């Protein structure tokens, strides 16, 4: 399985888009990096084909409309993240 994922910074609200064949391991690696401390997995897509996953990651990274469309679909979830972060 291959994954395309979004991480979100609770401090800056910045979104990071990535690709991995081992999602759990990759998220842990991100969180161990100083600049990604506290970042949370907010979304992922699973693909059987590595080629399809890489294409999707590139689409999200290089075509703003694709990423904006996805973020629009996640609007309610992002608001929930904000509320949870405010409680911490």
Segments predicted by a language model, with ranges:
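GIY-YIG nuclease catalytic motif and its immediate N-terminal context
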Residues: 1-48, 52-61, 65, 71-88
């Amino acid at each position: 399985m291959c994954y395309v994922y979004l991480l979100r910074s609770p401090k800056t609200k910045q979104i990071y888009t990535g690709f991995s064949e081992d999602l759990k391991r990759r998220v842990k690696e991100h969180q161990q990096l100083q600049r990604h401390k506290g970042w949370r997995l907010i979304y992922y897509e699973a693909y059987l084909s590595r080629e399809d996953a890489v294409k999707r990651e590139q689409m999200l990274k290089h075509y703003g409309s694709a990423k904006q469309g996805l973020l629009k679909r996640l609007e309610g979830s992002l608001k929930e993240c904000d509320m949870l972060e405010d409680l911490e």
